[in-house]
Amino acid sequence: MKKTPLLNIALSRLIASLGHGDIVVIGDAGLPVPPGVELIDLALTHGVPDFLTTLKVLLSEMQVERHVLAEEILLKQPTPLAALEGMTAGGELGQRQLMNHEDFKVLSRQARAVIRTGECQPYCNIALIAGVTF
């Protein structure tokens, strides 16, 4: 059995297959998944699993160079934003880029996968751009 926090087979496979610059999106329950992009659906019910827990567990195995947020999160979601600020300051999320929510949905077309959570707070979405460990 694995020693790291991430136990989900599909997520472990995804992270192991990433190359530098590949995009992984973690989305709330309402984020549309573009046709042709792999969906890894973790949602069980409202709030389970939540956005931040999913992100923290994914970061236990994924090297992130930078991340993208919809600028709407800055005004509409102070609690998740505070946690993201801490992760950014700690170096876990790399550099930040902001764009409007509609552009974020366009960016998600380039993702290797969209991970759907049970999060029901709007704009709790993040695009993670894979980095390298060397």
Swiss-Prot record:
Instruction: Please give the superkingdom of this protein's source.
Output: Bacteria
Indicate yes or no for the key word Glycosyltransferase. Answer: no
Q: Cellular location of this protein?
A: Cytoplasm
Q: Name one GO cellular component term.
A: cytosol
Keywords on this record? Answer: Carbohydrate metabolism, Cytoplasm, Isomerase
Which pathway does the database say it acts in?
Carbohydrate metabolism; D-ribose degradation; D-ribose 5-phosphate from beta-D-ribopyranose: step 1/2
Which top EC class applies here? Answer: isomerase
GO biological process: any one?
Answer: D-ribose catabolic process
At which positions is substrate bound?
D28, H101, Y123, C124, N125
- Single GO term (MF): D-ribose pyranase activity
Catalyses which reaction? beta-D-ribopyranose = beta-D-ribofuranose
* Family from the record: Belongs to the RbsD / FucU family. RbsD subfamily.
The protein's job, in short, is: Catalyzes the interconversion of beta-pyran and beta-furan forms of D-ribose.
Q: Which PANTHER family match?
A: D-RIBOSE PYRANASE
Quaternary structure, from the entry: Homodecamer.
Name of the protein this chain belongs to: D-ribose pyranase
Organism, by scientific name, is: Pseudomonas fluorescens (strain ATCC BAA-477 / NRRL B-23932 / Pf-5)
